[in-house]
Amino acid sequence: MAGLNPSQRREVVSLILSLTSNVNISHGDLTPIYERLTNLEASTELLHRSISDISTTVSNISANLQDMTHTLDDVTANLDGLRTTVTALQDSVSILSTNVTDLTNRSSAHAAILSSLQTTVDGNSTAISNLKSDISSNGLAITDLQDRVKSLESTASHGLSFSPPLSVADGVVSLDMDPYFCSQRVSLTSYSAEAQLMQFRWMARGTNGSSDTIDMTVNAHCHGRRTDYMMSSTGNLTVTSNVVLLTFDLSDITHIPSDLARLVPSAGFQAASFPVDVSFTRDSATHAYQAYGVYSSSRVFTITFPTGGDGTANIRSLTVRTGIDT
């Protein structure tokens, strides 16, 4: 009955009544049934309407669900786009994180460099302050010197006197220099006079062990304030004891050299004895000794040396090597 429309339901009811018309049923017995059927029809009608409303509602819901499906599809597409964007952002954030880490490391290195530079700047500041102080002090000293120079320049006479070897002429102070001692240079280094090699003959006289004389050929090498003697004999010297004194006097030079002054020792050199190397031949035996000489005056010196034996003998090939400061 639920699936029948009202007209169909009436026909069903009429059929039931016709089938039961031969049954002995009173009108009063059918009344409740009729009422119940009427109520049932009303309920069925109401149910049909409710089902119709529900169907409409379901149709609306279906339409809404379809709209929601489309909306969800759009949302899904948007979410996919957002997912792609978020992935790209994550990659960018990862790259940025790496860059930030690198920048942090560089910043730390730069901070260390800046700290070192700051320390250097602080040290330079101290040095500059000290330099400023020194410059200020030097400026005062220079100003004082300028004032003193101006005062000296404005004075007609400097009022100073100089002792040798300093001398003054026309306001210029000079140093009297010996060219054999130093050169006229800024540092006064070495001597400026040229070296000389003077060759001459010198007659030496034997005393205290010999009364003989011997002729010596002399090479005198003069350099600066030094003269080195290299002498050799041209004859024999007769000796009578085991020690002989041989005297050299500038007056006994037979061929005067070009610069006799370079054979005169300085006063300081004359104050002490000086070493002399002597060698000679006696009786075919060669003897060599280191003897000493002494000046008795600025022009005379005597050397004392062993003769290599006792008694009278002739010594030959006598050589004498020594040097003096002039």
Curated annotation (Swiss-Prot):
It comes from the Viruses. One of its GO terms (cellular component) is viral capsid. Its main location: virion. Keywords: Apoptosis, Capsid protein, Coiled coil, Host-virus interaction, Viral attachment to host cell, Virion, Virus entry into host cell. Gene3D superfamilies: 1.20.5.170, 2.60.90.40, Designed four-helix bundle protein, reovirus attachment protein sigma1, domain 1. The keyword Coiled coil applies. It holds the Pfam family Reo_sigmaC. One of its GO terms (biological process) is virion attachment to host cell. Residues 60-80 form a coiled coil. It is found in: Virion. InterPro entries: Reo_sigmaC_M, SigmaC_C. Structural protein responsible for cell attachment. Induces cell apoptosis. The C-terminus is important for the induction of cellular apoptosis. Belongs to the orthoreovirus sigma C protein family. Homotrimer. This is Sigma-C capsid protein. It comes from Avian reovirus (strain S1133) (ARV). The lineage of its organism: Viruses, Riboviria, Orthornavirae, Duplornaviricota, Resentoviricetes.
